[in-house]
Amino acid sequence: MNKIDAREAAWQLLTEFTQSESLRKHALAVEACMRACARKLGSGSPEDENQWGIVGLIHDFDYERWPSLEDHPYKGNEILKERGYSDEIRRAILSHAEYTGVTRDSPMEKALFACDELAGFITAVALIKPGKSLAEVDTKSVRKRMKDKAFARKVNRDDIIQGATALGVDLDEHIAFCIEALKPIAPQLGLDGSAAKAG
C-alpha cells in the first residue's frame, strides 16, 4: 500500500469509528504535530513521516466507542491487528496511554505522548481567543492557561511536561513547535478565524 492509500485507509478507519467532529479534529491536530516531529526527529523519509502521521491520526480512533480504561486503546489494538497494521504502529498507540504499561522507547512513541495532550490544549486555547484562531496563540498564552487548573480540566498538564522532557526538548520550544505544526491545518480545525467571523 503506498503512502497516500495508507493515509486514506487510516482516515477511513477513523471516520468509521469516530463520529464526533471534535475527536476527528483532535486526530488531525495530533497527526499534524506527529508529521512535524517526524521531519525533526525521524529519518526524514516520506515513509517515516507518513507512518508517524498515521499513528497520530488513529491513536484515539476507538475512544468514542470504547472510552473506558478497560477498553481504550486495547479494543483499537485488536482492530488494528485484524486490519494488518504493523506492530510498530500498534505499540506506539498502546504506549500513549500510561495505564497500559507499554513503555515509550522509540522516538515515534515519545512524540505521540508529547503531542497528544498538547495538541488538544493548544486547540482549547485557540477556541477562547476573540478570533478563534491559531494565529492568536503563542507559547506565553499556552503557558498562562496551563497554570489555570479550571481551564481545559481534562488535559493532563503533567503529561504535557513529561512529554517534552522525554523528547529531550524545552517545554516552551515544544509548545511553539506544535503551534507552528498546527497552523497549516487551521482551516480544517476551524481555527483560522472563520468561525468567529461567521458568529
Role assignments for model-derived ranges:
Residues 47-149, 161:
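Divalent metal-dependent catalytic cores for phosphoryl transfer on phosphate-bearing substrates
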Residues 1-68:
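Acidic/His-rich, divalent-metal-binding segments that scaffold phosphate/diphosphate chemistry
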Residues 19-24, 30-41, 58, 109-199:
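Divalent metal-dependent phosphate-bond-processing catalytic cores, especially two-metal-ion Mg2+/Mn2+ enzymes
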Residues 5, 9, 25-29, 71, ...:
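Conserved active-site and cofactor/substrate-binding residues in soluble primary-metabolism enzymes
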